Amino acid sequence: MEKKMRAADEAADCPVAFVTGASSGFGMLASVKLAEQGYRVIATMRATSRPEALTELAAARGVESRLVVRRADVTDAASIQAAVAYALGTYGRIDLLVNNAGYAQGGYVEEVTMEQWRAQFETNVFGAIAAAKAVLPHMRDQGRGTIINIGSISGRIAFPGYAPYAASKFAIEGFSESLRLEMKPYGVHVVLIEPGSYPTNIWEKGFASIALDDASPYRNCLERILRFSRQSASSKADPWEVANLIARIAADKRPRFRYPIGSGTRLLLAAKTLLPWTLIEKLVLRLLR
C-alpha cells in the first residue's frame, strides 16, 4: 500500500508535456525524448488510428508507460481544448507545450489556391495560437511553464516556391516574439526553435503539394526548386538533434528566445543580416539554376 502511495506521489511530481503533431518527425522524437527525461507526455495527433511509429519507438526505448496518445486536431479549437482538459484532469498540470504540428505547402504564389493558403495558415499559425491559448490560463495561474514553438529557418529567410510555408513561419516569428513579452511577467517562457533542413515527413508532404503542370509558366523553375529541396531534405542531418534541443530547453530555467539549429542555418542568418538584399537575390537565384 505504501509503495502504491509513494508511486502515486512520484507521478504527481512529474512534469507534464503536451506535444502537438506527435505522429512523426520532430513531434514524435520529442515526445519520446521528453518521456526519457522524466516527463509525462500527452502526445497528440490528428489521427490516433495510426500511432504505431510513436508507440513502437517509445516501447523500444522503454518509456511507453510515460506516454499517452490523444487525438487533437490543431485546426479544431474544441479538439485542442478537450485534449488539454484531459491532461489537466489526469495530471493536474501542464508544464510544457511543444507546438510542433505543421506542414509545408509548396508552389508559386500565382498557382497556389486560396484554399491552400488558408489551410496552411489554419494548421501552422492558427493551430499554434489555439494550442497556446488552451494552456495559457493554467500556466499563468501556476506561475510557470514553457511554450516551445517550432518555427523554421524559412521564417527568417524565404525561398521561391514555398511562399505559403515561409509566410506561415514568418507569422510564427511575430506571434512568438509578442507572446514571449506578454508572458514573461507571469513566469511563462516562450521559446522559438528555427530548424534548417532535416529528413522528416514535412518535406515529402511539401514536395507532393507542388503540382508540375506542363502548361505552367513556372514549370522549369519549380523543377529546379524541387531538385534543390530534395537534395537539402536528404541530408544526413539527424532530427534527433531537434528533439534533444527541445529536452534541453525544457530543463533550462532561463531559456533564451531563439534557437536556430541545423547545418548552415547560422550562416544563412548571418548572410541575410550582413549582405545587401541585391546580393542575396543573386545568390539564391544562382543556387536554383
Predicted features and spans:
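Conserved glycine-rich Rossmann-like NAD(P)H-binding loop of the short-chain dehydrogenase/reductase
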Residues: 37-54
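Conserved glycine-rich cofactor-binding loop
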Residues: 23-24
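The beta1-alpha1 cofactor-binding region of Rossmann-like NAD(H)/NADP(H)-dependent oxidoreductases
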Residues: 71-82, 114
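Substrate-binding pocket helix/loop in short-chain dehydrogenase/reductase
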Residues: 108-109, 116-118
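Residue(s) in the substrate-gating loop at a strand-loop-helix junction
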Residues: 152
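Active-site helix of classical SDR
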Residues: 132, 168
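C-terminal beta-strand-loop-alpha-helix "lid" module of Rossmann-like NAD(P)-dependent dehydrogenases
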Residues: 184-233
